[in-house]
Amino acid sequence: MADPDWTLPAPEVEAIVSGRHGDPFAALGLHQSGNDWVVRAFVPGAEELEVLDKDGKRLVWLPRRHQAGFFEGSLPLSNRQTLGYLARNAGGSWTVTDPYLF
């Protein structure tokens, strides 16, 4: 099965997790792709990442694409909105505000 059109190419994911991406704002955060809303996040140390709306409501789990903590997935949204994340690993959980939401 082919990746969706909005999937970030593997070399770009590698560039993000290694700190070499020339324009992380173009890749990370919430983006519209056709009729889909896509979110990408790099949360080092996270093994799981859940997207939260501005009120803290849990929206969806994001698939982890890179073990360093890169996550990407589509969201059931009708418009742009403020998002946060609930990150988890074996040591516990923590919340993250998406710094790329502008």
Q: What residues fall within each predicted segment?
A:
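Short proline/glycine-enriched turn/loop motifs at strand-loop junctions of beta-rich domains
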Residues: 42-48
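The feature marks proteins involved in alpha-glucan
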Residues: 1-36, 57-60, 65-102
